[in-house]
């Protein structure tokens, strides 16, 4: 399945591949 970008981003970094930080959560790149 595709990664879900819903984690909170810390210092502009997202742990899920293909996601970017749109504070305060990660969004699909």
Curated annotation (Swiss-Prot):
Protein task: Probably participates in a plant defense mechanism.
Lineage: Eukaryota, Viridiplantae, Streptophyta, Embryophyta, Tracheophyta
Name by which UniProt lists this protein: Cyclotide mden-C
GO biological process: defense response
Cross-link (Cyclopeptide (Gly-Asn)): 1-29
Disulfide bridge partners, by residue number: 5-19, 9-21, 14-26
Domain statement: The presence of a 'disulfide through disulfide knot' structurally defines this protein as a knottin.
UniProt similarity note: Belongs to the cyclotide family.
Residues of the signal peptide: none
Keyword list, A-Z: Disulfide bond, Plant defense
Pfam families referenced in this protein's UniProt entry, alphabetically: Cyclotide (PF03784)
PTM note: This is a cyclic peptide.
